[in-house]
Amino acid sequence: MPVRRGHVAPQNTFLGTIIRKFEGQNKKFIIANARVQNCAIIYCNDGFCEMTGFSRPDVMQKPCTCDFLHGPETKRHDIAQIAQALLGSEERKVEVTYYHKNGSTFICNTHIIPVKNQEGVAMMFIINFEYVTDEENAATPERVNPILPVKTVNRKLFGFKFPGLRVLTYRKQSLPQEDPDVVVIDSSKHSDDSVAMKHFKSPTKESCSPSEADDTKALIQPSQCSPLVNISGPLDHSSPKRQWDRLYPDMLQSSSQLTHSRSRESLCSIRRASSVHDIEGFSVHPKNIFRDRHASEDNGRNVKGPFNHIKSSLLGSTSDSNLNKYSTINKIPQLTLNFSDVKTEKKNTSPPSSDKTIIAPKVKERTHNVTEKVTQVLSLGADVLPEYKLQTPRINKFTILHYSPFKAVWDWLILLLVIYTAIFTPYSAAFLLNDREEQKRRECGYSCSPLNVVDLIVDIMFIIDILINFRTTYVNQNEEVVSDPAKIAIHYFKGWFLIDMVAAIPFDLLIFGSGSDETTTLIGLLKTARLLRLVRVARKLDRYSEYGAAVLMLLMCIFALIAHWLACIWYAIGNVERPYLTDKIGWLDSLGTQIGKRYNDSDSSSGPSIKDKYVTALYFTFSSLTSVGFGNVSPNTNSEKIFSICVMLIGSLMYASIFGNVSAIIQRLYSGTARYHMQMLRVKEFIRFHQIPNPLRQRLEEYFQHAWTYTNGIDMNMVLKGFPECLQADICLHLNQTLLQNCKAFRGASKGCLRALAMKFKTTHAPPGDTLVHCGDVLTALYFLSRGSIEILKDDIVVAILGKNDIFGEMVHLYAKPGKSNADVRALTYCDLHKIQREDLLEVLDMYPEFSDHFLTNLELTFNLRHESAKSQSVNDSEGDTGKLRRRRLSFESEGEKDFSKENSANDADDSTDTIRRYQSSKKHFEERKSRSSSFISSIDDEQKPLFLGTVDSTPRMVKATRLHGEETMPHSGRIHTEKRSHSCRDITDTHSWEREPARAQPEECSPSGLQRAAWGVSETESDLTYGEVEQRLDLLQEQLNRLESQMTTDIQAILQLLQKQTTVVPPAYSMVTAGAEYQRPILRLLRTSHPRASIKTDRSFSPSSQCPEFLDLEKSKLQSKESLSSGRRLNTASEDNLTSLLKQDSDASSELDPRQRKTYLHPIRHPSLPDSSLSTVGILGLHRHVSDPGLPGK
């Protein structure tokens, strides 16, 4: 595998560094963004929450002046001093009285420290809070020293006039002699809940006129300006609100020196300039206009006026002496200024801003260095404060990155030297120390032996490697690259330093010169210490553990190396024993006899050569390790036999461990490695196919490598699927145990509920710089941050920094539909997040209602990502969808009417034969569709049920009105195509067209009633429904659909029964065919029920002709009665007798027609089915008659 670079990807470690440095010292601090208005709080630690009693969601996005901690006893000049430090971007420490959430007070030292980015621009503020004990208060008689005098100069005021407000007055007094830092300002009535600040209007010429120069004499005194108006406590504080003037005796003690003046109404205040750039903005010329120092945040606080004789050398001072010396900053009332640069060319006016505003200063003015005192107080170490940016690890000079190319090449070189040491050290110790030729070479000097020179070079290389290891970075447990030399040295001392040091000592060089046997043996033993360098190889083995071929090759090399070592030992045993053996039975003597090179005691050079000895020894060890040997080289002495036994034992273990696992190694070669390379190949193919650009390509590859290192290629979902569900729940509960225990919302849940929640949680790993949620994304999940830190940005402005145990998303129980994100969420470091889908969470809460209330009450989002207008917009969208749905229905019906009128106009010229043919085809279609009417009923929405029932009920009456006159169609103004409408139970468009044809005269009848429209509005616009309410409404809707289906089934059965009774048909009145004499028209009966649905009014006689006015009146009345049935109204029943008499007359006249004409029509009867009709009376309800209606009397 390549060198792991995932650990060293650029990441923002700002939050982690601050927490690590502060939490260990039990600090209580907040972090504020200096580039936004009010310097909003974007992070607070747990110590601050415990100190104040406020939770983190309560503190986030509040101004860093901590207005919510202010109360009646909070000094205004202390608050103003904090505002001064924030405006000037300078470090300062102020003692302030704050209030707990429960209303109790505590005194706290507030320490403001600016944090800069790589350009030296202060991007954030760290505000640290320290308790002040009673002993410290007693030891400090005065927190602020009196003001030193300043020279009297012709100085003019910066006047801010508020003509609509009541202000305080002051009296002209003499000006002190020394105070070069003072800027005198007239302010309005103080805000009672914030350091910041009312809208300041641009000063006028009168406010900066020379006539006000003498007014400054009364302003600068050791005393404070006495408040002469009642100022209420902070609006947002939880403690009882009292009058501030009762709690400010120190502000009333100087009333004798500062009295009222009736001629002027203003309040004096003193502001200390924060930097030299502030003073550069002031000019002597009265026409100088000040430009807003922060171009992106114009807030309308432009100040102008003369200002001179100010010592810039004393400005921006942050030492304790200067803070105490120039103590007039404690006298500032609750207001904020935005000093601007001088610009004489033109005048820039900015729109007014909000009340609470602290304007971020200009970039170049935020270059104050953090003083040594700040570093001592915070104990931050050498790096003082981290920089808020995506940064690669800071590398000190002469420090080598552990993943650099040089280090990789050096490691391979050292590995080769280790292999050389492992091979030649045993060989030199066993074969060369007692060799006569080697002894002669040593006599001429250490450099005569080439092997000694190589050993010396190797020793030097290892010593250099030790020095390099002292300057090589490493990755700690937090996956951070450590480059501090001191930390590297400590880490190396605790690790491999001792082994490397012993292996690098050149022992043979240290004891060179003594030729005794004891020295020779000692040198041989000490040289074996170099074999400890092989431990370096173990450091690299895990990198190649995924490559089966590399592991197999490595094991084979280990096997050969062990055989080499054993061969050296085998020779050493025989060489040591040979002089003491009298019978010469050792394996060396046997070897000399076999190859014809016998030993001669008188000749030291006799016997086998070194090559023969080494090859024979190596042959013996290999044969013994792999088998029991062949016997040509055999042990003869006891020592040799014991060693042979040990070799056989080692051989059996080596053979079983190496060669027995060859198959497993090969399988791993095609398992883990195959998975890694296959996944990597997929990534590369994806990059190639989609032509991913290089920056994004590098991110993909680095994330894949890091994720593989992080999970070792294990898919947790696949692993969990192999276990039973109960075991999966236990595993998930263990994996999410920290989250479920630390989050307050999950406390008190039952074990079953926790198991269900754990099963729904998914773990997400995000690299630094990755955007988890984009602005505008649908919030489908709730996120819990378990490791790392993230930032939330709105328009590329950091609004919050979240760390461990923070929660972000939306309150899922408050909205029926998921909202959209209002910000981007981006990872600063490697993050682990637990997320649960919205539907899964609601499902669990629905299953455990007793836990639901507790969860929804205690769930506190650190940052709510839901857009502000999402809720109202969802309601408007639902209402708009309802209107669109209705418009689509109306337009669809109108199109159907147009097509229907066209068909009717085309059918006006059809003869009776075509009419009969269309009727027969329509009957077949009706028979085919009637069986499917139930499915149509079940698909109709509950809101459309009254409309549908009215339509079905009105259809038979329209057919009857048409057939009473033997007409197929009505006149052009209101005709209906009967053969297409009589059987259209399944087509809702046709069903609506039945109702809309006569509705042209009465448009209000086409739409549902007001009650129905109200029901539609409730069901379609009410979006804030819970899951249980939706289930209940669906159940009610299903019950209503079932009842409707049963009613329709009964209606269809009645229709089929009526169709079966009809055996004869009668031709219409205009037909030339006459009915037979035997035919007698049946009399129509009108069956009256207890609740009559409708009645038809008829006041005129009728003519069978379509041109007769009486006929048209009857048809009109019929259609009106149909519409009344559709809308559910009740009509009079007085006309039923009239209709019955008319029908009897019609039946008498029909006897003169030809019987053949009776067969031309056979119209099906539609049974009315109203919503309130019961099953018992549905069979006899309404008007029943046979189909044939040849005409009326008088034809």
UniProtKB/Swiss-Prot annotation:
Its main location: membrane. Residues 1-412, 471-494, 543-549, 663-1195 are cytoplasmic. Residues 92-144 form the PAC domain. A motif (Selectivity filter) lies at residues 627-632. InterPro entries: cNMP-bd_dom, cNMP-bd_dom_sf, Ion_trans_dom, K_chnl_volt-dep_EAG/ELK/ERG, K_chnl_volt-dep_ERG, KCNH_animal-type, PAS, PAS-like_dom_sf. The chain crosses the membrane at residues 413-433, 450-470, 495-515, 522-542, 550-570, 642-662. Residues 194-216, 870-915 are annotated as: Disordered. GO terms for cellular component: monoatomic ion channel complex; plasma membrane. SMART domains: cNMP (SM00100). It catalyses: K(+)(in) = K(+)(out). Residues 1027-1054 form a coiled coil. Residues 615-635 dip into the membrane without crossing it. NCBIfam families: sensory_box. Pore-forming (alpha) subunit of voltage-gated inwardly rectifying potassium channel. Exhibits faster activation and deactivation kinetics and slow inactivation at membrane potentials positive to 240 mV, resulting in the weakest inward rectification. This is Voltage-gated inwardly rectifying potassium channel KCNH7. It comes from Mus musculus (Mouse).
